[in-house]
C-alpha cells in the first residue's frame, strides 16, 4: 500500500512539474494537475493541501535530489579551499540544470506575491545553508578558518558561487553556463572566500 501511495505521489509531482513549468505558478491550477494525473482534485489535495505546498514539493524533489550530493564534498579532513571548490562545482552543476533554472525563474517572478518564496526558503535553502554553516563551524574549531558568524559566511560563499554567469543566465541575459565556466566560478568563489576567511 505504501509503495502505491509513493508511486501516486511521484506521479503527481511529475505532472505538477510540467504544468508549473508551462504555465507558471499563478496560471497553473490544481484541477489541471489532477486532470493530467488522471485523478480527482480530492485525491490531489489529500497529498498536497495547497498549490503552494505542491509547488514547493516539486522544487524540492527535483532540485534537492540534484543538490544533495554536493554536501558530500564537504569533508572535514580535506583542505578548506579544496573542499569548497569541490562543493561549489557540484552545487553549481546542480542548480544550473534547465529545470532548476526554470523553477528559479518562476520563484523569482511570483515568490513574493504568492507566498511560495518563504515556504521554499524554509524547507530548502535554509536547510542547505545550515548544513554548510555547520561545516564551516567545524573548520573554525579545527583552526582552518577565522572565527566569524558561520551562517553569514555560508550565505556569502553561496552568493560568490552564484554571481556572474549563472546569475546572468537566470536573469535571461545570456545562455546556459558551460562546464568550464562552472569550474572557473567555483574555483574563484573558493579562492576569494578563503583569502578572507581562511587561515594558512
Q: Which stretches of residues belong to each language-model region?
A:
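Amphipathic alpha-helical segments used for helix-helix packing
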Residues: 95-119, 166-171
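Hydrophobic/aromatic-rich alpha-helical bundle segments in the mid-to-C-terminal region
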Residues: 118, 136, 140-191
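Helix-turn-helix
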Residues: 11, 15, 19-53, 57-58
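N-terminal intrinsically disordered/low-complexity leader segments
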Residues: 1-7, 200
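Amphipathic alpha-helical linker/stalk segments
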Residues: 58-87, 93-95
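Hydrophobic/aromatic residues within well-ordered alpha-helical segments
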Residues: 8, 51, 58, 62-63, ...
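Amphipathic alpha-helical segments that line or abut small-molecule/effector binding pockets
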Residues: 14, 81-97, 101, 105, ...
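Amphipathic alpha-helical packing segments from all-alpha helical-bundle domains
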Residues: 94, 102, 116-142, 184
Amino acid at each position: 500500500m505504501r509503495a502505491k501511495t509513493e508511486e501516486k505521489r511521484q506521479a503527481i509531482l511529475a505532472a505538477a512539474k510540467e504544468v508549473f513549468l508551462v504555465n507558471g505558478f499563478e496560471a497553473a491550477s490544481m484541477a489541471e494537475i489532477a486532470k493530467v494525473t488522471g485523478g480527482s482534485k480530492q485525491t490531489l489535495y489529500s497529498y498536497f493541501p495547497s498549490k503552494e505546498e505542491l509547488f514547493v514539493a516539486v522544487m524540492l524533489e527535483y532540485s534537492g535530489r540534484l543538490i544533495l550530493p554536493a554536501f558530500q564534498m564537504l569533508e572535514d579532513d580535506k583542505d578548506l579551499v579544496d573542499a569548497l571548490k569541490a562543493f561549489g562545482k557540484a552545487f553549481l552543476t546542480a542548480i544550473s540544470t534547465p529545470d532548476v533554472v526554470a523553477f528559479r525563474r518562476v520563484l523569482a517572478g511570483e515568490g513574493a506575491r504568492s507566498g511560495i518564496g518563504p515556504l521554499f526558503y524554509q524547507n530548502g535553502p535554509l536547510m542547505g545553508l545550515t548544513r554548510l554553516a555547520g561545516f564551516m563551524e567545524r573548520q573554525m574549531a579545527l583552526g582552518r578558518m577565522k572565527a566569524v558568524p558561520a551562517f553569514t559566511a555560508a550565505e556569502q560563499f553561496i552568493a560568490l558561487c552564484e554571481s556572474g554567469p549563472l546569475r546572468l543566465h537566470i536573469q535571461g541575459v545570456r545562455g546556459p553556463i558551460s562546464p568550464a565556466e562552472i569550474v572557473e566560478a567555483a574555483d574563484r568563489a573558493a579562492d576569494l572566500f578563503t583569502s578572507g576567511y581562511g587561515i594558512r
